[in-house]
Amino acid sequence: MEKNCITVVKVGGAVVEDSSRLSELLDNFCKIEGRKLLVHGGGRSATKIAAALGIDSRMVNGRRITDAEMLRVVTMVYGGLVNKNIVAQLQARGGNALGLTGADMDVVRSHKREVKDVDYGFVGDVDTVDGSRLADLIESGVVPVMAPLTHDGKGNILNTNADTIASETAKALSAYYDVTLVYAFEKVGVLADSDDEGSVIRCLDKEKFEKYVADGTIAGGMLPKLENAFAAIKAGVKRVAITKDTDLEVRCGTMIE
């Protein structure tokens, strides 16, 4: 039986922090036909508010170190300030949006990341996404807006990479829908030269990705984004793209193969 289609859009923290760009993205998001779901980051907002509170932000390989103080900050910022701002803006555009963290309805459960070379602190690696509950919401006309917070089922909130939330959610929904996953951020796509917007890599497969990682072309925060993109394709997500926040139709971005 043919499945219905759904578009999962993940919007990055740089766009979330810029009110005019976020407004334009939400305009375009609302124009997407059919079922849709939004996952947001908010790292820049968290860093900014942490600094105002005198809390240092530490990153390793594009991933945030989340100690107890930073966990309180990201919970406030991701689950509150950023999420509810997006929900309110979607409501103003006629979207029946519902803000969620992974703890709400037990939608995303995770475990605290094991300490290996780096202790990331209160960071969660996803165990399960309840695609059935999300599908029930979506079929009732709700547009879920998911913050990058999960829980371990023992009363603990964990900070989880938003790209991972998007990928794992897309994978879970692929049991019910034909899923298109779009990573929307401040650049036109994956660039061969980070200073040249004209150097976008139009198609990227795993072999090319590994080559670009080895020679340093792809590094930092792009690494987890692409690792999650390839995991989604492998798990049955139909289409994955990385593109500029103004290009949700993916006319100019990078397609993952």
Spans of model-derived segments:
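C-terminal catalytic "cap/lid" subdomain
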Residues: 1-257
